[in-house]
Amino acid sequence: AIRVMGELIEKYGYGDWGECLTIADPKEVWHFEVFGEGPDKIGGVWAAIRIPDDHVGVSANIPRISKVDPKDTDNCMASANVFEVAKRMGFWDGKKPFRFWEAYGGGNYSGEMKSFSIREFFILNKLAPSLRLSYDAEELPISVKPDRQVSVTDVMALLSETYEGTEYDMTQNLKVAVKKKDSNETDTVISPVANPWMTRDMVNMLNGLKPDAVKSYRLVAVPQCSYSTVIQLRDWLPNAVGGVVWMAYDNPGQSPRIPIFCGTKDLPACFKVCGQHRYREDAAVWAFRRANKLATVRWGATKDRMKASIAHFTEKGQTELPFVESRYKEILTQQGEEAAKEYLTGYTADFAGATMLRWREMGDSFWTQFERGF
């Protein structure tokens, strides 16, 4: 697949911003990064690294690949021009060690010349604290071996991270005094209107009132996300049920994940309607986005309910998965492949419908909760 992608890039060109793509099958995972070759060239420059077995790799929209060794074909692939383009465009002098991210990247989200940002650092450090990784470093490994085995629900949790309760929590200084119920005593708590997805205008206003009240960090779960996926590949099962895409619309920190199997033949009609440009009740994304945005009005009063709903569907998906796998194989044996895939299609549709109903009900409830003012 990677070589075909490379051939297509060479033939037709790549004209977008730099991009990272993950190429995976049940046996291995490759990390593929690509850039354009310049305004006057049809082509592109790319490199791909195999993530070692038992490792977790992290990329969050900045180049991460460092050493490129085309001779190590078991673990590395690259376009034939990977070094030549860097020299021609003045990105690399050909003398110091070549680092792909340094040659072709423009720094991280903070403008620092690093091979990582806060998101990569946070996840890698959380998975392998024994490595004692430092944010002050110039480069972090593209992958680490976690200190303990990582489950699919661990990955879901990492994609929903807002750094709550850590030193990177953007709400940690937004505290108010609250009188305890049935007591004259007061307690200091995070303001219920504080949330990790505050707009730039809100952050600027708060910092104008009190300097450094909010220190902004790029979150793993960003509110402008259209959708996110956790892809689970199991080689001991038939491909149709062994491959599962756990998809979440909108903010990964606020939405449930819906199982879409490789054997799922079709999706609900609302999944086929784009809701990115305007509000549309017939677009699936708005079944979630409306409640998610309303919840941030008083996140302190809504987050427990929303997190409980996410946990409900996470548990439902994981608890029912073994039954779905077993039932698929049973139908496959008794009725054939088409009937088995129809079963998976129906399961995905039913699961999606249940999540959308829950989020629509929450959205209605939040409107009622805030009807007299936000």
Language-model region placement:
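C-terminus-biased signal that marks the final domain/tail of proteins
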Residues: 6, 17-19, 26-29, 44, ...
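Surface loops and adjacent helix of pleckstrin homology
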Residues: 34-35, 61
